[in-house]
Amino acid sequence: MEPGPKRDFSDFNPFSLKESGSSPPKDRVILHCDLNNFYASVECLDKPYLKNRPVAVCGDPERRHGIVLAKNEPAKRFGIQTGEPLCVAKAKCPAILFLPAHPASYKEYSQKLRRLYRRYTDQIESFGIDECFLDVTGSLGLFGTGEQIANELRTAAKATTGLTISAGVSFNKTFSKMGSDYKKPDATTLISRNNYKELLWPLPVENM
């Protein structure tokens, strides 16, 4: 049997081969769940009479020094900012009520939310006590689209804990985080390859 023609394999790269008819990989579906005004919201759940009062959680309210760690929605209406000195917050809103932090209570609520997230995926990355990234790519066949999963999580969180979530849904962590910041409180924002320029390009640089 005569040998066949010689072939040049000098440029052969096995990693560049594609299966015939194969489709490009699909985007992952990443959620970023952010518990709204977490510390202040927990305090108002434990003390319902505070719900409609401007409240800020801080380090040492007795000595009236330190900074604002968290504030509720009524306090936000007065322009209270996280991280600002208590004296500045008091000047903006003389009626504001400063509360001490209760870390054990915050941890308990945070764990409740983690258990809720695990109903939908085990691909969870904590981003602080009140924020998580969830990769729900493998859960879409069971629970629907990323938006549907985010909305179900928000509804379940409110029903079981009283807390609200702002959720961002996107194809990477950066955009999902920006999605959860885009609309608050208690909202879902989808940032896709089709709309990310429309939603994000007009934002101020400090929001990026």
State each model region's role.
Residues 1-208:
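Gly/Gly-Pro- and Ser/Thr-rich, intrinsically disordered tail segments characteristic of DNA damage-repair
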